[in-house]
């Protein structure tokens, strides 16, 4: 039996004939399988191709959308509304003094349909002061960081009157300000302007502490013409150092930059100057390459006191590697045409005098009150601080009716920075919007409060808060610190960033902080025009370097 099975197993099997229907089904099955295998083999490249098409179309769509939005913004910039409603005599008049951070923040926030708004400023533009150190060395053009004040005013809902003039006096009893403008012929034109509400945001002057010679021989860094003066002085010293064969000591003096002041402005300029020297001047003036020097002088024991100790140490080490000499505990006493005289405090407490030669002296000191601020101080006993105007929790000027103040002309618990002035301006803009709503709502249960012409802003605020005690229509100003930024050279920056949900500060330094610094400053620039120009300036410097023409 086993033998027969093995024989059968080895013999070929007889073929079993299949029906035509079975043969057709078999052929169809093989054809379907071959089609399926072919589609599987081709599915991978086709899928990849379709994904790339989707990505390409999405990218093109986003780019086209960005171009359209950019074009719309540019068109809006170039074509303000030619039919702004004119001032309404029935509305109250709000006068804003200045065109700085605080004033422009008010103008951004306020609803001009609620008031007849008048702006008075000696300059007809807003200056982005945070980038002034960059303009002094040519990293950014001066016109890239200014915005005409009329651009802001022409894009408001109602007409805003602007006077390019200086406010010389305030008559608080008559509610009148006196303004003066000097014509090109040297003639002084004067005018009076009546107000219902007045906002003093006229800023401050550079504090010199009565140091002899600082105003005559030093360069400040507060206005656009200061940056232009510094740049002209840099190039003048360079060419003068090469005019003829000079003693080595004299040549080194011409190319020695001294910066007095260890705050953010002084540190940023020192960093920008070091970049200018390393990236450009050493290439175009190779014979002076070994003579360039930058020294930073600070009277306090350390620089950048508003930053953390970790970031101060980082800046110190970076400046050391950049050959920027930081001299702390060194107070400026006198300035002459060629030297500065300083008093150095030694570790043992003793003091010694020292003379430092210089070619360019940049003074980055503090602020002092303008003449108008001093007059307002003298006009009320409640103005008892000589450093600036004293205000209450609503930024109302103490001792005066319907006068508010903000920014560098005031003395508060906050540092005199652009960040503080911007938040104060936004707060006052919202406060005036609420006051305007109280004054002009129809009908309103609050209207009987507002109709009293003799009621000043303090009375209105108090009555409104009493009537709505649960919600408090008017809240006191509260500053929210967002952090501190400073550029320290070599495409590096430092940043102390406040993170509310994190509960503490984040400290950043280096290249990452540098790009964060740039992104923040770009976002803070007033308009798309400013952002475009500054971005193009940065690209220009990266590609071609800084210009060294004496223009």
Curated annotation (Swiss-Prot):
Gene3D superfamilies found in the cross-reference section: 3.50.50.100
Chief subcellular location: mitochondrion
Keyword match Hydrolase: no
Catalysed reaction equations from the record: a quinone + NADH + H(+) = a quinol + NAD(+); a ubiquinone + NADH + H(+) = a ubiquinol + NAD(+)
E.C. number: 1.6.5.9
Subcellular location: Mitochondrion
Organism: Schizosaccharomyces pombe (strain 972 / ATCC 24843)
Similarity-based family: Belongs to the NADH dehydrogenase family.
Pfam families linked: NDH2_C, Pyr_redox_2
GO aspect biological process, one term: oxidative phosphorylation
Binding site for NAD(+): 255-291
GO molecular function: NADH:ubiquinone reductase (non-electrogenic) activity; oxidoreductase activity
InterPro entries attached to this UniProt entry: FAD/NAD-bd_sf (IPR036188), FAD/NAD-binding_dom (IPR023753), NDH-2 (IPR045024), NDH2-like_C (IPR054585)
UniProt name for this protein: Probable NADH-ubiquinone oxidoreductase C3A11.07, mitochondrial
Biological role: Catalyzes the oxidation of NADH.
Keywords assigned by UniProt, alphabetized: FAD, Flavoprotein, Mitochondrion, NAD, Oxidoreductase, Transit peptide, Ubiquinone
SUPFAM superfamilies cross-referenced by the UniProt entry: FAD/NAD(P)-binding domain
GO cellular component: mitochondrial membrane; mitochondrion
UniProt: FAD binding residues: 93-123
Boundaries of the annotated transit peptide in chain numbering: 1-37
Source taxon at top rank: Eukaryota
């Amino acid at each position: 039996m086993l033998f027969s099975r093995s024989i059968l197993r080895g013999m070929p099997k007889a073929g079993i004939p299949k029906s035509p229907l079975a043969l057709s089904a078999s052929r169809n099955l093989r054809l379907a399988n071959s089609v399926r295998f072919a589609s599987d083999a081709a599915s991978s490249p086709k899928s990849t191709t379709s994904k790339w098409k989707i990505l390409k179309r999405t990218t093109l769509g986003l780019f086209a959308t960005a171009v359209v939005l950019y074009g719309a913004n540019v068109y809006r910039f170039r074509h303000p509304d030619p039919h702004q409603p004119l001032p309404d005599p029935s509305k109250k008049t709000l006068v804003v003094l200045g065109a700085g951070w605080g004033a422009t923040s008010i103008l951004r926030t306020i609803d001009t349909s609620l008031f007849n708004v008048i702006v008075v400023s000696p300059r007809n533009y807003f200056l982005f002061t945070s980038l002034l150190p960059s303009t002094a060395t040519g990293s950014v053009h001066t016109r890239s960081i200014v915005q005409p004040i009329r651009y802001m005013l022409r894009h408001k809902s109602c007409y805003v009157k602007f006077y390019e003039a200086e406010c010389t006096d305030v008559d608080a009893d008559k509610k009148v300000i006196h303004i003066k403008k000097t014509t090109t012929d040297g003639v002084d034109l004067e005018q009076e302007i009546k107000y219902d509400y007045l906002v003093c945001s006229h800023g401050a002057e550079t504090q010199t502490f009565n140091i002899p010679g600082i105003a005559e021989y030093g360069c400040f860094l507060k206005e656009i013409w200061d940056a232009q003066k510094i740049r002209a002085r840099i190039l003048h010293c360079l060419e003068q150092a090469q005019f003829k064969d000079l003693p080595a000591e004299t040549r080194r003096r011409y190319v020695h930059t001294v910066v007095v002041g260890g705050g953010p402005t002084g540190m940023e300029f020192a960093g920008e100057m070091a970049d200018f020297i390393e990236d450009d001047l050493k290439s175009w003036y190779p014979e002076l390459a070994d003579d360039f020097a930058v020294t930073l002088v600070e009277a306090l024991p350390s620089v950048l006191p508003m930053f953390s100790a970790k970031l101060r140490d980082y800046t110190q080490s970076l400046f050391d590697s950049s050959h920027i000499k930081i001299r702390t505990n060194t107070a400026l006493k006198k300035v002459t045409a060629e030297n500065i005289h300083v008093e150095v405090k030694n570790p043992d407490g003793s003091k010694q005098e020292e003379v430092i030669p210089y070619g360019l002296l940049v003074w980055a000191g503090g602020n002092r009150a303008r003449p108008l601020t001093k007059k307002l101080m003298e006009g009320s006993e409640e103005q008892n601080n000589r450093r600036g105007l004293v205000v209450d929790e609503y930024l109302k000027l103490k001792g005066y009716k319907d006068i508010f103040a903000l920014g560098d002309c005031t003395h508060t618990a906050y540092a005199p920075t652009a960040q503080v002035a911007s938040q104060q301006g936004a707060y006052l803009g919202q406060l005036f919007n609420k006051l305007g709503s109280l004054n002009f709502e129809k009908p309103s249960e609050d209207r009987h409060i507002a109709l009293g012409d003799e009621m000043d802003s303090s009375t209105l605020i108090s009555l409104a808060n009493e009537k709505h005690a649960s919600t408090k229509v008017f809240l006191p100003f509260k500053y929210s610190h967002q952090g501190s930024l400073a550029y320290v050279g070599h495409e590096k920056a430092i940043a102390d960033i406040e993170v509310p949900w994190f509960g503490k500060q984040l400290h950043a330094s280096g290249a990452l902080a540098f790009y964060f610094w740039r992104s923040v400053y770009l976002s803070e620039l007033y308009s798309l025009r400013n952002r475009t120009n500054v971005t193009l300036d940065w690209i220009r410097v990266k590609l071609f370097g800084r210009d060294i023409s004496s223009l």
